[in-house]
Amino acid sequence: MGEHFTLKHISNDAVARAVERAEHYRLLNDPEQAESISLDVLAVDSNNTKARVILILALTDQFTGGGSHAARRALEQVTQLPSDYEKAYYAGLVAERQGRAHLSQGGMARAFAYEGLHEAMTHYERADALKQPGVDDAILRWNACARTIMREGLQPRDDEPEMQLE
């Protein structure tokens, strides 16, 4: 096991700049750094929604294959979001990115890709019902999932494998 450190806290005055840095590192495709900075912000400002959203996105940026551990961590953060709309929308985003991670694996994982994308569409439908006027982000994501399912010819997996009779 590695060495144990006591993490240092940033000052309240540094929160806004730290959130900017987290967003910057995420856009530079450095999700681990964005995750770390977001956690530092949330340690001193647990109600900082922007830092929480960046954390969720940074965790989903790290999905490979199913990304189950990162997905659980992302979903834990989703439950802390303030509105039902955000909870539904970002739960959809987590499911969508899990599905897309499965899709990138190919082979049998494609059936899991379908499930992730279909689950995302369900969350996006719920978010769409809760949206503010003029905010169609959930529709845009729903359409992207639908297009991927159709383009890739994804199908749900069979629950019961067929028995081979000889």
Residue ranges and their predicted role:
Residues 7, 41, 77-78, 127:
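Canonical positions in the second alpha-helix
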Residues 5, 33-36, 77, 118-119:
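Intrinsically disordered, low-complexity regions
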Residues 13-17, 45-59, 83-106, 136-148:
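Amphipathic alpha-helical repeat scaffolds of TPR domains
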Residues 44, 80-81, 130:
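Structural marker of alpha-solenoid helical repeat scaffolds
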Residues 2-5, 129, 133-166:
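Terminal, low-structured helical/coil segments at or just beyond the last alpha-helical repeat
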Residues 2-17, 79-80, 111:
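TPR-adjacent "capping" and linker segments in tetratricopeptide-repeat scaffold/adaptor proteins
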Residues 13-40, 105-108:
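Alpha-helical segment of the N-proximal tetratricopeptide repeat
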Residues 59-80, 90-124, 151-165:
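Short coil/linker segments at helix-helix boundaries
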